[in-house]
């Protein structure tokens, strides 16, 4: 945002130098990027008066002029301009002067006659025909009507005796994209009063506004407010010099008085405006609507714009006449013979304007301001200021009244002033009275301890925002450096984190490496693991903006993630791997926006020495390390992802806590893995509910252990787990461990049966076991096996 220091002085009186101003404003939070003098390029150019003219003796088109430059003796200057006469006031570039572009003017001779400078045109001073509409295009700029004096610096005449300050405005301060907003900031920073100006409109033009103009805001969700006034009997002409100079200082090209007024108000108030030629507004009706079926609009820059149905447009009864908040239409442009004008001062939804400007590739000054969601309360003072300027310039007759369509209810915003919390946050000791004073300087009143936030300050919503304002005017450089203070809390792990760390450590101790995979997977992963089409696990959380099809849903099973990594390792010729992961799955809940996010722990392995029982033993070891209740394994022949003869459910305390087995050969083939792949999945979240009481450590046994072996004959369908559970139940307190050491099928064993051998260890804590003790336990075990399972001793 660029502002003129001269223009700024209309609102706030400050005498600071440019350097002082930049420093104070930057320290107050409004960073100054650069400050440039407008007169930096023009040096030693003054107003001169042509005293006499005579023909050049060696040229038929040149004149030798004697010019009074206000420095005493007249100087001789040779010119070829034909529009200069004796008595004219003209710009004179004297000896050793500089013009825009680095042009250096010195004494010289033109066809043998000495010339001590140059008479200048407006173009040579860096101006355009819009800056000087009354000047000759190809002649010397005659200054007779400019109210200047001989010897006066030409920079003063053209308004270059000014500094342009460029501010870096953050998007949360839309009020500072205006001269008034920055004047308010300046007044607060320098602690001086701001000069407010309330527009005064005389009005009185003939006619009834409500009969001539109607406004229909159909897209009220995109247009919180629309204000319009009408001016009759307009006289299109160049703007006065002072207005042209101010617009030029803001980087805006003057066009004509009506258009210049809209731009002037935009700079001053930060409220974009537009002027329509009333005769081209068919039916005298302005409709604010979406483009709908309208396909194109030719904008003021002469380009045909292709409209999208949801773009906001300003239309009359039959056609669009402007792109709302971006640019007006060529079909309602202000031209030289315009008689009646409608001033639009509206507020549009920032996101809608940003979308339109981006789609059409036409970011204008207006759209840039609307994108920031400017204050809807600006529309009325802005349109009144425009009408006031019309009357000031004598550019037309303003009609009484206005049309103001308000589609929102202003909600007062208050924030409690909390001095103690603010001081604690800033590390200061500022009194409440000083805080109130800092806020008053910004025109933010405090009533009964409550801050009344003005409509133009959308950035003030919570205590931290208020603390920032206090710090700005107290001075960041005045805040002393202090050590951090406050209560500290010792860090620690939650029970879930402790269990996760322990599980990971146990897995790594067994040679497993941890992997971390994405929670986003492809829908095709369900087919890859042969998940049934009607499985509830196919109901997923879908991403709105996925990176691609392969990462378009949140996983409901963790198996595909493990198989992807195993497949990659197999493709890289890794002969054997052991991997584990603890990760979340995402299970949608009916009627809930967010899914359940239980954790799963999965183990995956392949290689020459890997098999079902090795993995089972490792799972038992990990569960034992975690102090989980003992697990039993129940055969599962229906899991489609696993081999039907080598899969079991992991059951703890009667609850299914996971699955273990060999991956189905078809699934392994889909993932490009040759050989046998073994996987175990655990409900890690559920494990927390089946933890055993804390371990009690006992002293080393004082009495010996007795070992006995049992070779049992059972049905082929009977599992080791069933036998082991029965033995433990019958063995009582004296039975310390049961270890499988052999499974035999062959001669001596009937068809359909198998021999399973266990090693049992017996021990008492208070005595040495006798043969009777040992025999009693073994007999009890054999009887239990025979009665419950029909198992006999081999």
Regions found by a protein language model. Name each.
Residues 114-131, 135-141, 155, 163, ...:
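Mobile "lid/hinge" segments at catalytic clefts and subdomain interfaces of large enzymes
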Residues 4-5, 23, 57, 63, ...:
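Glycine/proline-enriched, intrinsically flexible loops and inter-domain linkers
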Residues 47-77, 150, 245, 256, ...:
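Conserved mixed alpha/beta core segments that line enzyme active sites in large multi-domain catalysts
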